[in-house]
Amino acid sequence: MEWDTVIGLEVHAQLKTKSKLFSGASTAFGATPNSQTSFIDAGLPGVLPVLNEQAIIMAIQFGLAIHGTINDLSVFERKNYFYSDLPKGYQISQYQKPIVTNGYLNIQLGNNLEKTVHIARAHLEEDAGKSLHDAHTDYTGIDLNRAGTPLLEIVTTPCLHSAEEAINYLKTLHQLVRFLGICDGNMQEGSFRCDVNLSIKPKGSSVLGTRTELKNLNSFRFIEKAIAFEQARHQDILESGLSVIQETRLYNPDNNTTQAMRGKENENDYRYFPDPDLLPIHIDKEQIEAIKNNLPDLPEAISKELKNTPSLNDEDINFILSSPDTYQYYKKIKSLCPAADKTIINWLKGQYAAFLNEHNLTFETPPISAKTMAAFLSKIHEKKISSSIAKNIFSMLCTGEKDIDAIIEREGYQQQNDNSALEEIVEQIIKQYPEQVTEYKAGKEKLLAFFIGQAMKQTKGKANPEQINLLLKKHLG
């Protein structure tokens, strides 16, 4: 029997605010457990929540970026459930009136296919604390530093039908929130987590099957494997004549299986009701327009613009869009440097990227400033240094040197462009290798590279290779 897979995704993106959603406690990652916890985060009586305005602005930015509806009225509600890392006994969230509804993202699939993924809602809520199972052998610790951190929960409709579609959507969303600057996207630190809701149904059927939820996945690779396992598990159950149980499951990467965590709750189980301590949020059109006018460059628009640059291929564009810092670095160089786009990108994704990877660096804190890199690439463009000399200079720039002219002067790297001097060198090489000259004239044109190499060797890489090429062709006939 053939089956259709139906997937809906819920992403929890931690917002990059300096303080929490309803308190002034810091959101910085990695602090000593419970050192960034306010009274309200700990669920202590006598304090009221105070809404973080920056979180509202970030939610509106996201809503605009996904072409969604920014609701002029949204409400915070209490989501009631018991868990050890939720000291209040409820989570402040949004249910009936979220801040953003009805958006979409376009994703790229294989064979140049595009799919529109519908985003039903994006709402604000506070994160829970964290259980520390490994800190002690005989009990579980609770760290409330994360409790109260603002989350934007982004919920798709059940419109995805394969692991490939799910992963492409998640990568597109991950890229978007980073370019917006609202989330750092650090999956290892839990800044971008995903819940997968999955069911299968007979191929072509309009009736959805019973779904299971895969909770708190924080790796694209794990998400892909978890979906594949759960698809196969559902199929085995149904083809055995049994029924899938609606439940929440956890993915175990050690043995590539999912394991039951608890029965899956329905909305009624959470007993949502408006939080009496928080006023409704009213957002007017003027506020939305002001935020819209200050949106940064976004990946979809950047990609369309870059695709109009004939010299750049998809690999180049993907590299430029690999992070907001990479794009800004490329953009700054391009504004300062007359070099061709392909020259810029070849250096950035070639030697520069190799150096960054080797030293565990990124374009966020580059060893060479964009201004210095632009000056360096300008020297190559103006043919003031050869490509072989450029590699030497680049290595010096990576160690902290900044004055390219001083390096050229000190090392004697000025490119030789004197035509008569280069012609003399070419004539010497032709006399020095008569056998190779005969072979070249007999049709072995690959030997031209040999002659160019000899000229570069004699000039210690300082000769202009284009001039050498022309002079050799002239003298070899």
Swiss-Prot record:
It catalyses: L-glutamyl-tRNA(Gln) + L-glutamine + ATP + H2O = L-glutaminyl-tRNA(Gln) + L-glutamate + ADP + phosphate + H(+); L-aspartyl-tRNA(Asn) + L-glutamine + ATP + H2O = L-asparaginyl-tRNA(Asn) + L-glutamate + ADP + phosphate + 2 H(+). It comes from Legionella pneumophila (strain Corby). The keyword ATP-binding applies. Its EC number is 6.3.5.-. This is Aspartyl/glutamyl-tRNA(Asn/Gln) amidotransferase subunit B. Belongs to the GatB/GatE family. GatB subfamily. SUPFAM superfamilies: GatB/YqeY motif (SSF89095), Glutamine synthetase/guanido kinase (SSF55931). The gene is gatB. Coiled coil: none annotated. Keywords: ATP-binding, Ligase, Nucleotide-binding, Protein biosynthesis. Heterotrimer of A, B and C subunits. One of its GO terms (molecular function) is glutaminyl-tRNA synthase (glutamine-hydrolyzing) activity. Allows the formation of correctly charged Asn-tRNA(Asn) or Gln-tRNA(Gln) through the transamidation of misacylated Asp-tRNA(Asn) or Glu-tRNA(Gln) in organisms which lack either or both of asparaginyl-tRNA or glutaminyl-tRNA synthetases. The reaction takes place in the presence of glutamine and ATP through an activated phospho-Asp-tRNA(Asn) or phospho-Glu-tRNA(Gln). It comes from the Bacteria. It is an enzyme of class 6 (ligase). GO terms for biological process: glutaminyl-tRNAGln biosynthesis via transamidation; translation. The keyword tRNA-binding does not apply.
